């Protein structure tokens, strides 16, 4: 959990925002997935947001659903995902690692056992996409018991009560939603979110990272100009994996070429 605080303090000192890529663990297979994560970090990723393949991803658009299907086709299980997380943590001791997932996966293990396992492999945060703030008590309590930051989504239409709850219960960072709907690079992020960012700051919320529809450096810059601490990009990255599925080396090169200007856009 402290890795986020350390990261945001360091970035603030350098007058930089965070660039955070999202990928699905095990897409398109375990070995290549680990290489992808190394490539993202080498190219400048400040933190990682990782999905565990799940059969019914509600908030995901077709791009990320396909990533899940590819991981399933490779026979990737949640147990293997945790093994991967352990390997990633060993190799990269300081980078914040966040999971973005669905409640069924947490229930399958048992809530407390799930967060205990996260702590054991070195996961810093968990966002359970289909659990609203008002139903989050058992999740966030287990998370905090195991030194894992509970992450909450702040939608563009959040009212004062919701903003207060998010600020009060969230740790690590706040997932600031560019817009309602499903994920996807086609649906470009619509700003301004300045008023939300200002309110979150007023209530001392964890630093906001803007996600959904972030696919170009100008959007990263716009998010940071609006006061966000950084930006999360998922579908645009997963699409690169999809497009170069039969050219593993080229895939890694194209991913790096995508991440470098996205990271550069975080520097004011």
UniProtKB/Swiss-Prot annotation:
Against InterPro entries, the record matches this protein to: Aldolase_TIM (IPR013785), RibuloseP-bd_barrel (IPR011060), Trp_synthase_alpha_AS (IPR018204), Trp_synthase_suA (IPR002028)
CC terms in the record's Gene Ontology section: cytosol
Q: Where is the active site?
A: 49 (proton acceptor), 60 (proton acceptor)
Pfam families assigned? Trp_syntA
Q: Which UniProt keywords apply?
A: Amino-acid biosynthesis, Aromatic amino acid biosynthesis, Lyase, Tryptophan biosynthesis
Pathway, per UniProt?
Answer: Amino-acid biosynthesis; L-tryptophan biosynthesis; L-tryptophan from chorismate: step 5/5
Q: Which reaction does it catalyse?
A: (1S,2R)-1-C-(indol-3-yl)glycerol 3-phosphate + L-serine = D-glyceraldehyde 3-phosphate + L-tryptophan + H2O
The EC number on file is 4.2.1.20
> Which GO-annotated molecular functions does the record name?
tryptophan synthase activity
Amino-acid biosynthesis found in the keyword field: yes
Which superkingdom? Bacteria
- What SUPFAM superfamilies does the entry give? Ribulose-phoshate binding barrel
Stated role: The alpha subunit is responsible for the aldol cleavage of indoleglycerol phosphate to indole and glyceraldehyde 3-phosphate.
Q: How does it assemble?
A: Tetramer of two alpha and two beta chains.
Family of the protein in this entry: Belongs to the TrpA family.
Q: Which HAMAP family match?
A: Trp_synth_alpha
The name on file for this protein is Tryptophan synthase alpha chain
């Amino acid at each position: 959990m402290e890795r986020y605080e350390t990261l945001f303090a360091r970035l603030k000192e350098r007058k930089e925002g965070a660039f955070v890529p999202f990928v699905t663990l095990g897409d398109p297979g375990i070995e290549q997935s680990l290489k992808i994560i190394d490539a993202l970090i080498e190219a400048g990723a400040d933190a990682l947001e990782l999905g565990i393949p799940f059969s019914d991803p509600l908030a995901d658009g077709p791009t990320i659903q396909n990533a899940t299907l590819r991981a399933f086709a490779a026979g990737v299980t949640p147990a293997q995902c945790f093994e991967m997380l352990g390997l990633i943590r060993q190799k990269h001791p300081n980078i914040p690692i966040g999971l973005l997932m669905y409640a069924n996966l947490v229930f399958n293990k048992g809530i407390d056992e799930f967060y205990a396992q996260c702590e054991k492999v070195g996961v810093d945060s968990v966002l359970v996409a289909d659990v609203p703030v008002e139903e989050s008590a058992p999740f966030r309590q287990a998370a905090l018991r195991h030194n894992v930051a509970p992450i909450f989504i702040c939608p563009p239409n959040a009212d004062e009560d919701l903003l207060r709850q998010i600020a009060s219960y969230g740790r690590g960072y706040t997932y600031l939603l560019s817009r309602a709907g499903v994920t996807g690079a086609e649906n470009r992020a619509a700003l301004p979110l300045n008023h939300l960012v200002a309110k979150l700051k007023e209530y001392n919320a964890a630093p906001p990272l803007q996600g959904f529809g972030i696919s170009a450096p100008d959007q990263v810059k716009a998010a940071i100009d609006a006061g966000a601490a950084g930006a999360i990009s998922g579908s645009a990255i997963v699409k690169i994996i999809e497009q170069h599925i039969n050219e593993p080396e080229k895939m890694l090169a194209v991913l790096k070429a995508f991440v470098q200007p996205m990271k550069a856009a975080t520097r004011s």
